[in-house]
């Protein structure tokens, strides 16, 4: 592993920001640290950068223990949420700053700045000041400045949080392409699931100072290992007793479960008569219908259980109070600190592929 964190602990007073955190990162990977506020993700980033000192544990970069190395000797570039550009310096001087500190010659600095401005797609803004740039442009320049000294590791702390939604989405793709192009090992902090899933090679899910799960975006989404991950990733609803649902009646012991909208199929009452799994469908009443662009989001009540599913735009419209039939295809069962996928028995027994 190129980066290794081994049994890292960090507290701020009574608050445990990192609780025995251990994981490794391969060289050249783009890793997303994803979790709610206060979960410890930014603390991990700051300890890697040498801006915070861990209470115990080891940080290894390229086979070298960096516990005692100051931040300026770790070979790390850091991009902050607030850009942290010097407002009184031109774009050129902002990018050149780290190179001047390294006492590089003027010819090298000029060439390197030109390369980076080309890399970030802003070759003509060198003479401008930060306040003459848009938020997206400023973040690109902040990345160029971080890359200027040719670091071995790039750290990004919620780099797109201060940018509007449309530009943020464009910058995700740009960041992914840029990092692929230069091949630098990178770690970024985010609380935005879409951002982590779209950009990262692997995601580290943090919660209350601990690592809940590590995996690629598909694994994290489809195979959550803990109840927290199952609830945190995607749009999820907790069901207290899933044994009351058709196809799941044989449940024993703890019967809490998590259901996502994509696990649910909603049909108008009168359209379900010839459905192959009609006998396994629940009667429900529509509580609310919301337009979501490419589909409708329907909240419905099965007895006292509230569920949310998707409903196609080209189907007959639903409204509050309509009776519908609901097929719950699968769910995630919750058993203490683990989750398991449980498929509706009718579908599991059928030769039809329906999930």
Where are these regions (language model features)?
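ABC ATPase nucleotide-binding domains
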Residues: 30, 71-77, 81-225
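The feature captures the beta-strand-to-loop junction immediately N-terminal to the Walker
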Residues: 34-36
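ABC ATPase nucleotide-binding domain helices that frame the ATP-binding cleft
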Residues: 42-45, 141
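Helix-to-loop junction immediately C-terminal to a conserved catalytic motif
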Residues: 49
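Conserved ABC transporter NBD signature motif
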Residues: 57-65
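Non-catalytic connector elements of ABC transporters
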Residues: 247-355
């Amino acid at each position: 592993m190129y980066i290794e964190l081994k049994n890292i602990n960090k507290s701020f007073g009574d608050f445990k920001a990192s609780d025995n955190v251990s994981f490794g990162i391969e060289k050249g990977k783009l890793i997303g640290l994803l979790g709610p506020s206060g979960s410890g993700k930014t603390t991990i980033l700051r300890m890697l950068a040498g801006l915070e000192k861990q209470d115990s544990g080891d940080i290894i970069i390229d086979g070298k223990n960096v516990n005692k190395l100051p931040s300026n000797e770790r070979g790390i570039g850091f991009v902050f949420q607030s850009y942290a550009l010097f407002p009184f310096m031109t774009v050129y001087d902002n990018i050149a700053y780290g190179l001047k500190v390294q006492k590089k010659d003027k010819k090298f600095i000029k060439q390197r700045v030109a390369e980076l401005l080309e890399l970030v797609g802003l070759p003509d803004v060198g003479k401008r000041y930060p306040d003459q740039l848009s938020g997206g442009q400023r973040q690109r320049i902040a990345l160029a400045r971080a890359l200027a000294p040719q670091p071995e590791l790039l750290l990004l702390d919620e780099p797109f949080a201060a940018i509007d939604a449309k530009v943020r989405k464009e910058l995700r793709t740009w960041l992914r392409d840029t990092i692929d192009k230069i091949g630098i090992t990178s770690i970024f902090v985010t609380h935005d699931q879409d951002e982590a899933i779209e950009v990262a090679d692997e995601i580290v899910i943090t919660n209350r100072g601990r690592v809940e799960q590590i995996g690629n975006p598909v694994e994290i989404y489809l195979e959550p290992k803990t109840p927290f991950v199952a609830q945190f990733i995607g749009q999820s609803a907790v069901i207290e007793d899933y044994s009351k649902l058709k196809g799941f009646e044989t449940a024993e012991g703890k019967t809490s479960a998590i259901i996502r909208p994509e696990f649910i199929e909603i049909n108008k009452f009168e359209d379900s008569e010839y459905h192959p799994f009609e006998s396994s469908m629940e009667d429900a009443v529509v509580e609310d219908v919301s337009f979501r662009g490419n589909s409708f989001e329907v909240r419905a009540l099965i007895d006292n259980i509230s569920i949310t599913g998707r409903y196609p735009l080209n189907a007959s419209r639903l409204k509050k109070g309509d009776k519908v039939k609901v097929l719950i295809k699968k769910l995630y069962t919750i058993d203490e600190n683990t989750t398991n996928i449980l498929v509706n028995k009718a579908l599991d027994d059928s030769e039809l592929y329906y999930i």
